Amino acid sequence: MAQRREATATSEFGSGRRENHDSSRFYDRFRAPVISTDDTVNPVGDLGDGCILGDARYMGDLADNSVALVVTSPPYFVGKEYETAVAGRPNAGVPTSYLEYLEMLHDVFAECVRVLEPGGRIAVNVANLGRRPYRSLSADVIRILQDELGLLLRGEV
């Protein structure tokens, strides 16, 4: 009969073996997410052709808890034509600094979270900014979604 290995525990610098590994000490250091027990899904009104054109920061046409999946590819803060095209318009909401850009993303994602039904998912397509060195936009997006808005990270591609 094979000898059973003793369980390992999280150490300061990781662990060499993972069989029966108890990582609870590691995860206990993080704030536990609050998971809603509300399972109410609100109906969506008639969307016509299924498309809504507008600012994702203001989705008043959509009810709370009414969308199962949000797929978004927010504009990048890299000086593209769409940024300069609306930059001269008052109240266009075009950020002038990276911190303002992240605040705008927070507003967009907060509105997306509002319309997500319980158990709904949000898929965000972003790329890092710049090249060697680069700014990890994906890390900033994860921070907003997970730490500020309380979503659970399910994966990255």
Where are these regions (language model features)?
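Core catalytic lobe of class I
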Residues: M1-V157
